[in-house]
Amino acid sequence: MELVLKDAQSALEVSEATFGREFNEALVHQVVVAFGAGARQGSKAQKTRSEVRGGGAKPWRQKGTGRARAGTIRSPIWRSGGVTFAAKPQDHSQKVNKKMYRGAIQSILSELVRQERLIVVEKFSVEAPKTKELLSKLNGLELSDVLIVTSEVDENLFLAARNLYKVDVRDVQGIDPVSLIAFEKVLITADAVKALEEALA
């Protein structure tokens, strides 16, 4: 299959397996959920009644005071007491094998092509790290909410986009399923398309 280059009167021959695959919603959902789960810090920690400082002595005798019986001031029903089911640090990451991950990325790329949200250009760069220059180029392509994918990290492009809302710059190694679906359009260079094909082959 072919992808038309926006800035040139030509087309790029690409793999049907990478850019013409049927959309697998269940697979994409699973991989996106796993990606989000892996990003969780998982460091929340609370103390149980046995871990809270103090509470060794019985606050008052068992009988005769008229008050409810109590054995420790660190009971979960007391103020400053321990937490009944205390949260502990945990790993939220989910296992996703390489074949599934590649399949999800291919599925997303294919759907972007079908929805005409993937824009391919021969080259895309800025002379200097100037936001105004990048904004001018994006306006020329009628793009505002866009992920820019290049084959290698372009420092000028990265710095120019850093202060723009709904604009992000990634190299091929830096893309992930969430970033691909988070933006309205994906602008990708021809070199990045070839690099993606090799990575997903």
Curated annotation (Swiss-Prot):
<dbReference type="InterPro" id="IPR013005">
    <property type="entry name" value="Ribosomal_uL4-like"/>
</dbReference>
<feature type="region of interest" description="Disordered">
    <location>
        <begin position="43"/>
        <end position="66"/>
    </location>
</feature>
<dbReference type="Pfam" id="PF00573">
    <property type="entry name" value="Ribosomal_L4"/>
</dbReference>
<dbReference type="InterPro" id="IPR002136">
    <property type="entry name" value="Ribosomal_uL4"/>
</dbReference>
<comment type="function">
    <text>Forms part of the polypeptide exit tunnel.</text>
</comment>
<keyword id="KW-0687">Ribonucleoprotein</keyword>
<dbReference type="InterPro" id="IPR023574">
    <property type="entry name" value="Ribosomal_uL4_dom_sf"/>
</dbReference>
<keyword id="KW-0689">Ribosomal protein</keyword>
<comment type="subunit">
    <text>Part of the 50S ribosomal subunit.</text>
</comment>
<dbReference type="GO" id="GO:0003735">
    <property type="term" value="F:structural constituent of ribosome"/>
</dbReference>
<dbReference type="GO" id="GO:1990904">
    <property type="term" value="C:ribonucleoprotein complex"/>
</dbReference>
<keyword id="KW-0699">rRNA-binding</keyword>
<keyword id="KW-0694">RNA-binding</keyword>
<dbReference type="GO" id="GO:0019843">
    <property type="term" value="F:rRNA binding"/>
</dbReference>
<comment type="function">
    <text>One of the primary rRNA binding proteins, this protein initially binds near the 5'-end of the 23S rRNA. It is important during the early stages of 50S assembly. It makes multiple contacts with different domains of the 23S rRNA in the assembled 50S subunit and ribosome.</text>
</comment>
<comment type="similarity">
    <text>Belongs to the universal ribosomal protein uL4 family.</text>
</comment>
<protein>
    <recommendedName>
        <fullName>Large ribosomal subunit protein uL4</fullName>
    </recommendedName>
</protein>
<dbReference type="GO" id="GO:0005840">
    <property type="term" value="C:ribosome"/>
</dbReference>
<dbReference type="GO" id="GO:0006412">
    <property type="term" value="P:translation"/>
</dbReference>
